[in-house]
Regions:
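Conserved class I S-adenosyl-L-methionine
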Residues: 76-86
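Generic detector of well-ordered alpha-helical packing
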Residues: 65, 83, 108-109
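Mobile beta-alpha loop/short-helix "lid" or hinge segments that flank ligand
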Residues: 36, 87-90, 133
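S-adenosylmethionine
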Residues: 100, 104, 108-217
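Conserved SAM-binding loop of SAM-dependent methyltransferases across substrates and taxa
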Residues: 87-100
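Class I SAM-dependent transferase core
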Residues: 2-77, 112, 118-128
Length: 217
């Protein structure tokens, strides 16, 4: 069954444009299609997202998750953690792009955990796990190999920067926060902010805020 048969007229052209623009392999394109279908199906029983139109899912979920690759070389990462993964953004799209990089999806909502685990199984993703620990417990009780933490529409920055506390096993990792164009750091966050990068998604301007325990020289 084609995308048009599933989602209506013009969906095929839109989907092919997405595949071409992002340079997806046939396997990756199929995984994104499976993910799209599961997102729509599960949303009827689990509140995953308010964004359900195909163009908006592509722009504001898939591509918004994927644009970080223009600023981070994922091929060099030994481990990535998606904080407050929710319906899997940005973790699942990035895992599809980089199947060999280990990922942890951090999510406390049991229904969303079930969805994420089902997506991982259906898409055949490997070297990826879902953790239902809250953020503070994760920092206290785990010691995974993680180079990059990602937070998109989850916790506030003053909570996220707990990762840089002296007792944290992840204090030397990098953190990237999906921010609005007008977001400004508070006095707690400012010492850890090392870079801001702006980007466009759909008709919106947004930015990435990069944090580290060491300022660049």
């Amino acid at each position: 069954m084609s995308i048009t048969e599933k989602f209506g007229d013009n969906a095929d052209l839109l989907w092919q444009s997405f595949i071409n623009k992002e340079g997806l392999t046939p396997t990756q394109a199929h995984q994104f299609e499976q993910y799209l279908c599961m997102l729509r199906d599960w949303n009827e029983k689990v509140n995953l997202t308010r964004i359900l139109d195909i163009p908006d899912i592509i722009a504001y979920h898939f591509q918004d998750s994927m644009q970080i690759v223009h600023h981070v070389d994922f091929t060099k990462l030994r481990g990535v953690c998606d904080i407050g993964s929710g319906a899997g953004f940005p973790g699942i799209p990035l895992k599809i792009l980089y199947p060999d990089v280990p990922f942890i999806l951090l999510e406390v909502n049991n229904k969303k955990v079930a969805f994420l685990e089902s997506v991982i199984e259906q898409l055949g993703l490997t070297n990826i796990m879902v953790s239902n620990l809250d953020w503070r417990t994760f920092l206290r009780q785990t010691s995974h190999t993680i180079d990059l933490f990602m937070a998109r529409a989850s916790l506030q920055v003053d909570e996220l920067i707990r990762v840089f506390k002296p007792v944290s096993p992840y204090k030397h990792a990098q953190m990237v926060y999906w921010a609005s164009q007008h977001w400004q750091p508070g006095p707690q966050e400012e010492p850890f902010l090392v870079a801001r990068k702006t980007y466009s998604v759909g008709d919106q301007q947004r930015s990435y805020a990069f944090f580290s325990d060491q300022k660049p020289q």
